[in-house]
Curated annotation (Swiss-Prot):
SMART domains listed in its UniProt record: TPR
Start and stop residues of the TPR repeats: 59-92, 93-126, 127-160
InterPro entries: TPR-containing (IPR052658), TPR-like_helical_dom_sf (IPR011990), TPR_rpt (IPR019734)
Protein's UniProt name: Tetratricopeptide repeat protein 33
Gene giving rise to this polypeptide: TTC33
Organism, scientific name: Homo sapiens
């Protein structure tokens, strides 16, 4: 009679050498998969680098073309080239700064300020961008903001004589002229009309007995004066006589003898 026992696992029938062979093959396949995945990621990264290099190269080409057009005063075409370059390299502060200069040459101050602000935003350590921003702000009449921008540019590059002698000096001169003009305007302004506050006017009680009595006396006096009419009568001989005529219709002297004048 056969004795009862646990069933052996199938794997136990496989020899140790065969098992090791399977494990080695599985490890090789895993290495191949890992290598393929690594190669794929590397290829994507390399392709991205190539695209970025191509964009940067194309952007530089467009930048140079725009600069050449701007030197020949073909400003609109230069702006178009730089806009195309910004599509490829939107973080290039130099493109915004150059665009701002050209817009100032076209007397388009609001877009010039906006472009200079974008240049400062992309590269706040660029003294050229701050200098251009200050000049654009001067074009808008924002003297205080322009002075601040020039001061930032000097803080970045303190040895720049152009900012000291031209930009900042000119901005401060304009500021002094503005202050003088404001003082003159203020001195020539007409005197303001004095406005009385309600508290400065006495609050009379027009229904008091005293006010009513005064009004009644004035009315009675006017009534008495109007009841009498005064006439100046000039006689034919030239004599002048003043006659008071009553309201009851008193008859004046004969008109054939006197000439009546009122």
């Amino acid at each position: 009679m056969a004795s009862f026992g646990w069933k052996r696992k199938i794997g136990e029938k496989v020899s140790k050498v065969t098992s090791q062979q399977f494990e080695a093959e599985a490890a090789d396949e895993k290495d191949v998969v890992d290598n393929d995945e690594g190669n794929w990621l590397h290829a994507i990264k390399r392709r991205k680098e190539i695209l970025l290099e191509g964009c940067a190269e194309k952007s530089k080409q467009l930048k140079d073309e725009g600069a050449s057009l701007a030197e020949n005063k073909r400003y609109r075409e230069a702006i178009q080239k730089w806009d195309e370059a910004l599509q490829l390299t939107p973080n290039d502060a130099t493109l915004y700064e150059m665009k701002s200069q050209v817009l100032m040459s076209l007397h388009e101050m609001f877009p010039a300020v906006h472009a200079a602000e974008m240049a400062v935003q992309q590269n706040p350590h660029s003294w050229e961008s701050w200098q251009t921003l200050g000049r654009a702000q001067l074009g808008l009449g924002e003297i205080i903001l322009a002075i601040r921008s020039f001061q930032v540019a000097l803080h970045i590059y303190p040895m720049n004589p152009e900012i000291w002698k031209e930009d900042l000096s000119w901005a401060r001169t304009l500021q002094e002229q503005q202050k003088v003009a404001q003082r003159i305007k203020k001195s020539e302004a007409p005197a303001e009309v004095t406005h009385f506050s309600p508290k400065s006017i006495p609050d009379y009680d027009f229904e008091s007995d005293e006010i009513v009595a005064v009004c009644a006396a004035i009315a009675e006096k006017e009534k008495t004066v109007s009841a009498n009419k005064t006439m100046v009568i000039v006689s034919a001989s030239g004599a002048i006589e003043t006659v008071t005529e009553k309201e009851d219709g008193a008859t004046p002297p004969d008109g054939s003898v006197f000439i009546k004048a009122r």
